[in-house]
Amino acid sequence: MTHLQSGRWIAVLYLGVSLVTNAVIAADEPFRPEAGKFPPLEKAHAYRGELVFVDHANRRGSLRVQGAGGTYFRNAPHPFAMLPYGIVRYQGAPADLRDIPLGTVLHVRGFLPPDPKTSAVPVLPVNNRNKTAGYSGKGIAPAENHVLLLEDESSYCQRVGKVWNLKRVELKNNQGKIDASLQSKSSKDIEASEETMTFDAATRIWRGRERLEIQDLIDEGIWPASGKKSLDDQTVLLGITWKPTPSAVFTRFHISDIWLDDTAIERAARNQTETHKAFIRSRWMPAWVDAVEYGKFGSATVTATLFGGMDGSLYADFKKGSSGLMNAVESTLKHGHGAYGPAHMACRGPIIDVVRTDGEVPLGSSGIQIRFKTDLIIEGIRPGRVVRVRPGNWPQVNVPREEYLGTSTIEERFPTPAIFPKY
């Protein structure tokens, strides 16, 4: 594969090879984020697992975490919650939890709950990642279940500068196994361990602007119709999932996608970027409040930092002198206030300043601070609280009922089975 193109976001995400050793040491100690501060990525606990449940409206879900043991399929789902400024990446682009198919294997960088009293998922003992769970081994239920960065395999590889080298393929009846090793793009590790993964007729193969099938590779003589063949360390990016495996193999992952070149993964990233841009424009840009200057008769000037991880064109819409709306939200980014949606009770007014931070910006922050003036401030827009902001040129639409709060009850924040109608 030629040099993989990377977006501007990598400058924020990639902290440099020199930090790797320090990151490992720092990550050994559980870290709890502080209110009003973006936590350092190098202090996050790293793990990976299969997405098995999603509550997209509350930005939480469950992963089957890969532990030190060999019986992966026995590992119980482990709940996680996205931090308000937490970033989701899918196929090399910004994403929402709703964009990621169940079964996708994801890489996690997580922390302890910032405030255990308001956690949207169970709060576990601080040392829980060191506990052994039978044959599953250690690490399947870490207490660091509040996520700063959640990314699929292709996004992870692009961020850290790695690729998969395909060693050999074994094929029979349009399904089989591939042996591959994960390598650095810049240097080859001859001692890198190989991993065997399965594929089948549903595996998507992308080359340039084409989507190929296994039969296409057979017809071109690249893969055998049956049997084994060396792939000569072909460099690719992979999408990885998990499926039940025959032959009493307890832990073996499955290939959902193979991107054969830069063009293929760049097209996937562009498509996902457009999906996410449309989503954010309808749900508004998340931010947190740095300061509030109160004026007379309910007027106020709010200083807020926009959260990071979005496409640059979204931030470009925040311009000095343009109009905007600001609404208070939960730590789940679910809109509060309003009987029929976020615009009902939102503060209105002009954006009077936009300031971009020079230098390194922590993951989770955009490095962009806005000042917003309103003649009627609402409860919930206070320093340290999370808000969503809509520039005046974004469409005003009504979000679905499950994505905003009409009351402040715990039942509405986290619905129980009682929400179902009684027929």
Model features per residue range: what roles?
Residues 21-85, 90-423:
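Short, flexible, surface-exposed loop segments at domain boundaries
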Residues 6-8, 17, 338:
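Intrinsic structural disorder/low-complexity segments
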Residues 10-22:
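Bacterial N-terminal signal peptides
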